Each structure stands twice: as C-alpha cells, then as structure tokens.
Amino acid sequence: MNLFQNAKFFTTVNHLKDLPDTPLEIAFVGRSNAGKSSAINTLTNHVRLAYVSKTPGRTQHINFFELQNGNFMVDLPGYGYAQVPEAVRAHWVNLLGDYLQQRKQLIGLVLIMDARHPLKELDIRMLDFFHTTGRPVHILLSKADKLSKNEQIKTLSQVKKLLKPYSDRQNISVQLFSSLKKQGIDEANRTVGSWFDAADAAASSPKEN
C-alpha cells in the first residue's frame, strides 16, 4: 500500500501556537532547492500537492497533509536560502527548530538531500540537532537520475559510511530517490510505514507501573 497515496492538504501554520491537534506526524525537511516539494509530489502521486518552484525557499510555513491512515505528513520550510530578509530567516529557523524539538506527535524525519551534493554543512547541522530527540531519520538522496548508475552506487556507499557515527546513536537510514524516474517510492513507503507501525505498537503495549 502506498502510504502517501491520496494525501490531501489539511492546513498551513506560521506559529507553533497554531499547530493542529493531530495523532502522529512525519516531517519532510531539506535544503532549499534539494527537491523536497518534488519528492512529496512523487510520493503522493500528486502533481501539485506541494508547490514546486524554480525559486528556492518557496515553502515559508509549516504545511500539513492528511494521509489515508489518518496520520499526517508535514512539509517544513527549507533551510539554507539566504536571499530573504534576516528577520524572516530568523523566524524560519526558530519555527523549524522549535517544531522539531517540541512536537510530541512527530515520530520521524525525512531529510531530503541532493544526491550530487549530499551532507552539506547545514545537513550535518540538522542531523546533529535532530539526533538529540532520539527519533528516526530517513534520508532521500534526491535527483539520483542526475548521476550515472556507478555514481549512484558510489554516492550511496559514501553517504552510508559518513552516517555511521549517527547510526550508532539512533535509527538512521538512507536511499536513492528520483522524482523524474519514480525511483525509490516503495523503499520510502516501507521505511516510513514502519515508523507508524512501531508507534502504534508502542501505544498499544501495556504500560509498566
């Protein structure tokens, strides 16, 4: 089953106080222009569920989409886009950071990186920041179609090696992904689906006194 199929827009917020009361959430985040919106549209099989723009930094709010299992997918503002006023960028940083650290419904993070330029400084800072929550991270190396088959294999191997220090501390996984070639959809579904399954199992387990 495609977990993301038939996802529908729910609401958009610009302040933590306006966050909706939801059951469980997984969030998508990445550098501006890393292909986050295209990845969301590909996973949901929807042409314009998330707005795709040639201008980086287009996602400026926290956008909520309801999944068919009743849980939610959250599209977070991209990071690393400098051509906005300092006050606006500071608001994005605070909004993003506070959501990732404080949101109790958040069960995992999907981090989008351009396969041609993975693990840039801000990506590493995001991993360092989020790992303190103990929640899982799944990395989509987007735009994999821009690489040859051999380059894809090499890049995936290198990224896995660089992620070893993180994977020792938390559940972290990585895969190749291409919106153009529809590559990696099933793998992303299985990984994120396992997060929801684990959260549901934990919620239904008897609590110890």
From Swiss-Prot:
Record-level GO BP terms: division septum assembly
Residues that coordinate or bind Mg(2+): S37, T59
Cofactor or coenzyme needed? Mg(2+)
Give the matching PROSITE patterns. G_ENGB
Q: Which GO terms describe its cellular component?
A: cytosol
Superkingdom field: Bacteria
Which residues are in the EngB-type G domain? 22-198
UniProt keywords, alphabetically: Cell cycle, Cell division, GTP-binding, Magnesium, Metal-binding, Nucleotide-binding, Septation
Q: Does the keyword Ribonucleoprotein apply?
A: no
Which Gene3D superfamilies does this one have? P-loop containing nucleotide triphosphate hydrolases
Which GO molecular function entries does the Swiss-Prot or TrEMBL record give?
GTP binding; metal ion binding
Q: Which InterPro entries match?
A: G_ENGB_dom (IPR030393), GTP-bd (IPR006073), GTP-bd_ribosome_bio_YsxC (IPR019987), P-loop_NTPase (IPR027417)
Which family does the similarity line name?
Belongs to the TRAFAC class TrmE-Era-EngA-EngB-Septin-like GTPase superfamily. EngB GTPase family.
What's the stated role of this polypeptide? Answer: Necessary for normal cell division and for the maintenance of normal septation.
What NCBIfam families is this protein classified in?
GTPase_YsxC
The record's annotation in PANTHER family points to:
ENGB-TYPE G DOMAIN-CONTAINING PROTEIN (PTHR11649:SF13), MSS1/TRME-RELATED GTP-BINDING PROTEIN (PTHR11649)
Q: What is this protein called?
A: Probable GTP-binding protein EngB
